Amino acid sequence: MTKQRIFVAGHRGMVGSAIVRQLEQRGDVEVIVRTRDELNLLDSKAVQDFFASERIDQVYLAAAKVGGIVANNTYPADFIYENMMIESNIIHAAHLHNVNKLLFLGSSCIYPKMAKQPIAESELLQGTLEATNEPYAIAKIAGIKLCESYNRQYNRDYRSVMPTNLYGPHDNFHPSNSHVIPALLRRFHEATAENAPDVVVWGSGTPMREFLHVDDMAAASIHVMELDREVWQENTEPMLSHINVGTGVDCTIRELAQTIAQVVGYKGRVVFDATKPDGTPRKLLDVTRLHQLGWYHEVSLEQGLASTYQWFLE
């Protein structure tokens, strides 16, 4: 039996590394990866040459330039250009070299700032985007539309998934530009080590957010990639578009902070600074389609936070 040759682009990132971990447990596939030094995804000729020589059967497109609000505001040209180039180069090369299937990993920032909650797939392009990361979001929307367009024009089977807020091993724990879960894990860890009497969390604690462990994201990605084409098309008509991936359950930032305090073993007070901005009151993805396709998340928030904290400690 010939093994399927699967290229995971972005294998050193949080999602890409989780997909590689799960694929490598199987005996029927050969996982192909390249570091940035080995293959510059911004170089279209290099990408073409790679696909010409490697005979790839499937692609997981998890490579992206990512960053926090400050980075997105400081380098908007880099975010839109590099992400659009990575997507265009890989999707076009995959098409030219007859890659059967491709899965593009997007981001829930593609949806309008004031989207109806929970956010269904049909909310795409129904309103104005969040200004702070608009260039990144536009690039991710372009990736969805590239997949759609190659499906429509060339009868390709290129699919897209839109994850909610992700966390887990290999997340960015940088002190100044990490997302809420790694930022709070680090802050409570340091407060515990220093016996700090309280930890201040920005905002009122009332905004609702949804969080998905990266191992669940990887499992969902593989599940969606492996669906029969007819089943996929029935669930993404009329535009052969994208599917949301999340838990369908959200929690307040207050509940999140208190859970993290318990996981870390912090015994002091958790204080909310309501003078600081809260951001969007609620952001929850509608995952009805994903559930209809037979996939549900398995890692609870408590389990996921505990294992992520263990990874951080190691």
Regions found by a protein language model. Give the residues of each.
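NAD(P)H-binding glycine-rich loop region in Rossmannoid oxidoreductase-like domains
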Residues: 45-84, 96
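Conserved Rossmann-fold NAD(P)-dependent oxidoreductase catalytic core, especially the SDR/UDP-sugar
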Residues: 88-133, 159
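SDR active-site strand-loop-helix element
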Residues: 9, 34, 59-65, 102-108, ...
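Conserved beta-loop-beta element that borders a ligand/cofactor-binding pocket
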Residues: 101, 106-107, 144-172, 182-184, ...
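Adenosine-cofactor binding site in Rossmann-like domains, unifying the SAM/SAH pocket
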Residues: 24-49
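Active-site helix of classical SDR
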Residues: 135, 139-142
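C-terminal substrate-binding subdomain of Rossmann-fold SDR/epimerase-dehydratase oxidoreductases
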Residues: 3, 9-10, 14, 18-22, ...
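Catalytic tyrosine of NAD(P)H-dependent dehydrogenase/reductases that use a Tyr as the general acid/base
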Residues: 127, 136, 209
